[in-house]
C-alpha cells in the first residue's frame, strides 16, 4: 500500500537517502559545483579530500554550503608544508565538517559518517611530517582505535558510512584494483592497513554497508586504462572509489561536465544504488555508470 496506518494517521513512507560524493577535487571546485548541488538537492555531500595543495579557497567554499556535509582531508591538502600550518588552517575552516579520526552525524538526513585517518597517502601506514605536527605521533593501533571509537559513538539507529581519503588494504594488488599502485612496477596493494583493521573490528559490532574513498585516480597512470572503482565483499560491505580526476570536463558535443559519485540507501542502511555520474551545468544527468545494482550483461 506504500504507507502503514498508525491509529487514525497515515505514517509517511521514508524515502531513500541520496548522497552526492565529490572525489579528489584538485582545485576543480567553483560556483558551478555549488549551483549544481542546489539544483540536485541531495540529502548530503561527502568529500574525500585532496581539495587543493593546501590553499584555503575550497575549504572556505565548503564551509559556506548549507547542505549537510562531511569531509576528510587528503595528502595533497598538507600543501608540502611539514610544519602542518596549511593543514591546521583548513581544519579550522572546515570545523566540525571534517570528520577525520572522528564522527559526524548528519541530522537531517540521518546518517553517521566516521572518518578514517586524514591526509593519508596510502601504502600501508605512515604519518607525514605535517600530520605529526598537527596530531603528534600516532601509531597504527592507535589509529585503528580512533576509527573504531568513532564508530562505537555513532547512533546505532543510523546507517553507518566510513569516509576515507585512501581506501583499505585488502582490495587487490593489481594496478587496476581499487587501491592498486599503478605508477610504479611492480604493482601492489596501496591501501591503508589501519582502515582495513578498523573495518574488521567495526563489523563485529554493527553493520557497515559502505566505505567511500578516493586518492587512487580512476585513470591508470602507466597503462591509461581504467581502474576498478567498486567492490562488494562477501559480507556485503561496498567499497566505492570516487577519484575521477579531472572531475571537470567537456564531452564530444562541447557540453561542460561535472562529476559526482551518487549513492542511494535506505534509513536501515540497505544500499539501493551506486553510480558515477556526469552532470551538465543545469543539473541534467548526461552520463551515468551504474555500479549497483550491477547491470545485467
Kindly label every feature range from the protein language model.
Residues 21-24, 45-50, 69-75, 98-101, ...:
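Active-site neighborhood of phospho(di)ester-bond hydrolases with catalytic His/Asp-centered motifs
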Residues 81-104:
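Glycine/small-residue-rich loop that forms an oxyanion/phosphate-binding "nest" at active or ligand-binding sites
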Residues 108-159, 185-191:
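Binuclear metal-dependent hydrolase catalytic cores centered on His/Asp/Glu-rich metal-binding motifs
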Residues 2, 7-15, 104-107, 201, ...:
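Binuclear metal-dependent phosphoesterase catalytic core
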Residues 26-32, 52-57, 76-83, 105, ...:
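Active-site environment of divalent metal-dependent phosphoester hydrolases
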Residues 11-14, 157-207:
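Active-site-proximal segments of metal-dependent phosphoesterases and phosphodiesterases across multiple
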Residues 16-26, 110-124, 161-165, 237-244, ...:
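Active-site-proximal beta-strand elements of phosphoester/diester hydrolases
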Residues 1-70, 78-86, 296:
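N-terminal active-site segment of His-dependent metallophosphoesterases
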Amino acid at each position: 500500500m506504500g504507507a502503514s496506518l498508525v491509529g487514525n494517521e497515515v505514517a509517511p513512507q521514508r524515502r531513500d537517502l541520496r548522497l552526492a560524493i565529490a572525489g579528489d577535487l584538485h582545485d576543480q571546485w567553483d560556483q558551478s559545483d555549488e549551483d549544481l548541488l542546489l539544483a540536485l538537492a541531495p540529502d548530503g555531500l561527502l568529500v574525500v579530500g585532496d581539495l587543493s595543495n593546501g590553499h584555503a579557497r575550497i575549504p572556505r567554499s565548503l564551509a559556506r554550503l548549507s547542505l549537510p556535509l562531511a569531509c576528510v582531508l587528503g595528502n595533497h591538502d598538507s600543501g608540502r608544508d611539514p610544519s602542518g600550518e596549511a593543514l591546521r588552517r583548513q581544519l579550522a575552516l572546515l570545523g566540525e565538517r571534517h570528520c577525520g579520526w572522528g564522527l559526524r552525524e548528519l541530522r537531517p538526513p540521518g546518517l553517521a559518517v566516521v572518518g578514517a585517518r586524514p591526509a593519508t597517502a596510502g601504502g600501508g601506514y605512515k604519518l607525514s611530517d605535517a600530520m605529526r605536527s598537527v596530531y603528534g605521533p600516532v601509531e597504527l593501533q592507535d589509529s585503528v582505535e580512533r576509527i573504531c571509537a568513532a564508530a562505537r559513538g555513532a547512533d546505532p539507529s543510523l546507517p553507518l558510512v566510513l569516509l576515507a581519503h585512501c581506501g583499505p588494504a585488502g582490495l587487490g594488488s593489481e594496478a587496476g584494483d581499487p587501491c592498486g599502485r599503478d605508477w610504479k612496477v611492480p604493482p601492489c596493494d596501496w591501501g591503508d592497513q589501519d582502515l582495513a583493521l578498523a573495518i574488521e573490528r567495526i563489523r563485529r559490532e554493527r553493520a557497515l554497508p559502505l566505505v567511500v574513498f578516493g586518492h587512487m585516480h580512476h585513470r591508470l597512470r602507466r597503462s591509461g586504462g581504467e581502474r576498478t572503482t567498486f567492490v562488494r565483499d562477501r559480507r556485503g560491505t561496498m567499497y566505492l572509489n570516487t577519484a575521477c580526476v579531472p572531475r571537470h570536463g567537456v564531452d564530444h558535443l562541447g557540453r561542460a561536465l561535472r562529476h559526482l559519485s551518487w549513492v542511494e540507501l535506505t534509513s536501515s542502511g540497505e544500499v539501493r544504488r551506486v553510480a558515477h555520474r556526469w552532470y551538465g551545468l543545469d543539473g541534467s544527468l548526461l552520463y551515468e555508470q551504474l555500479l549497483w545494482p550491477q547491470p545485467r550483461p
